[in-house]
Amino acid sequence: MTKSDLIEQLAASRMHMPAKDVEAAIKEILEQMASTLQNGDRIEIRGFGSFSLHYRAPRVGRNPKTGDKVELTGKYVPHFKPGKELRERVNIIE
């Protein structure tokens, strides 16, 4: 599902809200989440999961094209940990 798909589905299920308003709300939610992570804070949505930053230490990588070794600097990357309810909901055993 893409962001556009999400906006379309939410607008269809919320007849009283125009797609333009749904799109603005989704964009604002995502912007607030990005800003929170950028500030180094954690986001927790109960029943869904939490977003945080994980540090990746500097390391020596390899250029896949040439095979040359490349020094990679340390960096922070977003990390998502699903909540118990989400894990149980998607654990479909057939």
UniProtKB/Swiss-Prot annotation:
InterPro entries: Hist_DNA-bd, Histone-like_DNA-bd_CS, IHF-like_DNA-bd_dom_sf, IHF_beta. One of its GO terms (biological process) is DNA recombination. Keywords: DNA recombination, DNA-binding, Transcription, Transcription regulation, Translation regulation. It holds the Pfam family Bac_DNA_binding. One of its GO terms (cellular component) is cytosol. The keyword DNA-binding applies. The keyword Transcription regulation applies. One of its GO terms (molecular function) is DNA binding. Belongs to the bacterial histone-like protein family. Heterodimer of an alpha and a beta chain. This protein is one of the two subunits of integration host factor, a specific DNA-binding protein that functions in genetic recombination as well as in transcriptional and translational control. NCBIfam families: hip, PRK00199.1. This is Integration host factor subunit beta. It comes from Aeromonas salmonicida (strain A449). The gene is ihfB.
